């Protein structure tokens, strides 16, 4: 009586997954959470998926294409999260909730957040690759209750994003650890001062 080698029935779970653009991008997001932005390559992701690097080119054109797709997904995640946490809240309460969620996302997903910092938001002929007003919509909706017109609310939303992003980057690069300041209190006070000044901009 003969028996088949044990390896005959082994299957790589990742290989059993049917690959398409979505599964490749989802795998890249998980990879970023675990290994970080700099470690993401076509070959490294292929190993993660139990396949060969060239096979991924059936689903993404290049590493740059994959990174742009990943960044788009990260932006969708962040905007969706901001809509969720601001739902049912108004004015400063909504702004504080969004700011806290934004900072938390960056801390919990530093690899994904790097997608916002490591690539330009312009294409090869300097055209924007994102719809900035659509991305700012959660903030502009919360800010709009202060009676600001659409353009002023948008500009204020960009200022809020700049403040949050700048603070997060100081934390992620270790700057905040080197000064005698409670980062939680400092962040909350920064956002509070921003919200308090909105009524004066009408």
Task: Enumerate the language-model features and the residues they cover.
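N-terminal intrinsically disordered/low-complexity leader segments
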Residues: 1-19, 202
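Helix-turn-helix
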Residues: 23, 27, 31-65, 69
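Amphipathic alpha-helical linker/stalk segments
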Residues: 72-97, 127-130, 134-144
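N-terminal hydrophobic signal/anchor transmembrane helix of membrane proteins
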Residues: 78, 86-89, 95-105, 186-202
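Hydrophobic alpha-helical connector segments
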Residues: 83-112, 123, 150, 157-160
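Short secondary-structure transition hinges
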Residues: 104-145, 169, 173-181
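Amphipathic alpha-helical packing segments from all-alpha helical-bundle domains
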Residues: 123-159, 185-196
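Amphipathic C-terminal alpha-helical segment
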Residues: 162-180, 196-202
